[in-house]
């Protein structure tokens, strides 16, 4: 019986190789760990993809990103392709906001800016300033429409999006 038990443990898989790296992307420090034979290569690929998504799509502070352009659209309708990541993420954000009865609000970008969360200088905005900024928030100010060719997105009444609350997860 003892020999049988020992033979079973010998048949188990050995611990997988792992590689860990600390990465700064999306205004956040992240620890990535990848397991498997090609862990280092997979980690390199994951880090590259994170930076690409951040800079090209999800950053609201990088002038070349899709989200930056949408936030700067001043209420103009923006067209997106059917396979674009941004409208799918906006749809998910709106769904989560609805499910949480507004506790999660992706339209708080101006409020976050007022506090200085994406800048080097933090400050406490006045109650009047916050009241004014909050008048431009709420998911009702995001018009997301599925079209035959993809999506259209319109941010109404000065609304701006920050998708950091879900883009990282």
Language-model features: locations:
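A contiguous, well-ordered beta/alpha segment that forms the leading edge of an enzyme domain
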Residues: 11-164
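Sec-dependent N-terminal signal peptides
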Residues: 1-3
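Short, conserved phosphate/pyrophosphate- and ester-handling motifs at nucleotide-, phospho-/glycolipid
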Residues: 168
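C-terminal motif of bacterial Sec signal peptides marking the signal peptidase cleavage site
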Residues: 6-10
């Amino acid at each position: 019986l003892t020999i049988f038990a020992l033979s079973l443990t010998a048949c188990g898989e050995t611990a997988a190789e792992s590689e860990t790296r600390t990465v700064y992307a999306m205004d956040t420090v992240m620890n990535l760990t990848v397991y498997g034979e090609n862990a280092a290569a997979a980690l390199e690929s994951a880090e590259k993809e994170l930076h690409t998504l951040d800079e090209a799509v999800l950053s609201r502070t990088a002038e070349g990103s899709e989200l930056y352009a949408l936030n700067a659209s001043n209420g103009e309708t923006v067209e997106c392709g059917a396979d674009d990541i941004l409208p799918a993420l906006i749809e998910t954000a709106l769904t989560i906001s609805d499910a949480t009865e507004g506790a999660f609000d992706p339209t708080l970008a101006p409020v976050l800016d007022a506090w200085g969360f994406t800048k080097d200088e933090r400050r406490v905005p006045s109650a009047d300033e916050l009241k004014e900024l909050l008048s431009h928030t709420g998911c009702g100010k995001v018009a997301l429409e599925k079209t035959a060719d993809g999506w259209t997105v319109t941010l109404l009444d000065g609304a701006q999006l920050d998708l950091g609350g879900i883009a990282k997860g």
